[in-house]
């Protein structure tokens, strides 16, 4: 199909959806879209990794940062203008950058299936313990329905909102959903064997693998190096957690675990602000596009490293968290995520 025909059809779909618009409906769609923004992802990952479940937080963090970096690279390669650039009549909200694929759709299809699997799926409800039977008949457990709604329904709803708001063609949303679901399914299927394989590598080889992945993403990302830097720093921080010790998120009282969040945000903000100051000073002394991109990469890499490694170390030093031997950590994490009655 000719791309122009596809985009014309997409504009027709957007116009048809917008004929039902109202201030209230538009507000609802903007609220739905918020649940697939970087700020919301950031909050979810930090809350999980620092306070609730470090293993799930780490997986979701790697997945959403990688998915976002991949989305940025593809957008820079395709360079498809947004629908409201092609037809100003569908303009409702301002969005920067290119259109294809939809970042909100891809991000939600990456995050929410993993959230449903590793967070919501960590425990069975009472109905599941009974084998899903009710009145002698087998029914789909409520917890399974909830996980399906989160894993599939929410990404579809977010994609719908992006079309309604006129910031993406239907084809953008479909492309983003496919990429996101492929990413989340890949994490679910291959995370454990890949992690087991890489864990036997030397730290230098692990670092080389991370550097190669980030380098390849950088080749297609144009001037957008932020997420690539965050991915590098986040994975570098994981490498720094050696095989003898792991950050134990479950240690501490509820208040101690809660205090990690404002403390970690403050430390991350200071580190990020420091590198922002360095970046601004360097640009005033010797400005160049290459220097600007490098400093932006370093700034976000530092942020990812602080979140992944330095903040947990600070929590441990201040008595807000503990470390445990990796073997014990794995057993404890397995116990936390294993459904009751299934653990060996």
Task: Please report, for each region that a protein language model flagged, where it lies by residue.
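N-terminal transmembrane-helix/juxtamembrane module of multi-pass inner/ER membrane proteins
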Residues: 1-40, 71-99, 252-263, 267-271, ...
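Membrane-embedded catalytic cores of phosphoryl/pyrophosphoryl-handling enzymes
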Residues: 28-29, 42-50, 58, 68, ...
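Membrane helical hairpin/interfacial module
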Residues: 51-81
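Hydrophobic transmembrane alpha-helices of secondary-active transporters
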Residues: 53, 236, 307-310
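Low-complexity, compositionally biased segments
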Residues: 56, 130, 335-337
């Amino acid at each position: 199909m000719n791309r122009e025909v596809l985009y014309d059809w997409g504009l027709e779909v957007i116009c048809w959806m917008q004929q039902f618009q109202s201030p209230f409906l538009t507000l609802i769609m903007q609220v739905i879209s918020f649940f697939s923004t970087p700020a919301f992802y950031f909050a979810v990952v930090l809350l999980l990794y620092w306070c609730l479940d470090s293993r799930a937080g780490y997986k979701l963090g790697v997945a959403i940062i990688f998915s976002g970096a991949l989305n940025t690279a593809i957008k820079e390669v395709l360079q498809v203008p947004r629908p409201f650039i092609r037809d100003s009549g569908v303009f409702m909200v301002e969005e920067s950058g290119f259109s294809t694929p939809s970042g909100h759709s891809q991000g939600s299809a990456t995050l929410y299936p993993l959230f449903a699997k590793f967070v919501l799926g960590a425990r069975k409800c009472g109905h599941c313990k009974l084998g899903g039977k009710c009145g002698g008949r087998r029914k789909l457990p409520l917890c399974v329905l909830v996980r399906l709604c989160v894993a599939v329904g929410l990404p579809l709803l977010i994609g719908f909102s992006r079309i309604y708001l006129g910031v993406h063609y239907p084809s953008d949303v479909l492309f983003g959903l496919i990429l996101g679901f492929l990413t989340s399914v890949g994490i679910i299927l291959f995370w454990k064997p890949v992690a087991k394989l890489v864990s036997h590598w030397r730290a230098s080889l692990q670092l080389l693998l991370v550097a190669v992945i980030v380098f390849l993403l950088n080749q297609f990302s144009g001037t957008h190096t932020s997420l690539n830097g965050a991915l590098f720093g986040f994975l570098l921080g994981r490498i720094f957690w050696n095989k003898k010790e792991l950050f134990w998120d479950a240690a501490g009282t509820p208040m101690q675990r809660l205090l990690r969040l404002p403390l970690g945000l403050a430390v991350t903000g200071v580190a990020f602000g420091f590198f922002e100051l360095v970046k601004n000073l360097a640009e005033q002394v010797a400005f160049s596009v290459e220097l600007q991109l490098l400093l932006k990469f370093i700034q976000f890499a530092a942020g990812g490293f602080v979140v992944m490694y330095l903040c947990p170390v600070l929590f441990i030093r201040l008595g807000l968290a503990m470390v445990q031997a990796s073997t014990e950590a794995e057993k404890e994490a397995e116990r936390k995520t294993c459904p009751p009655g299934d653990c060996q």
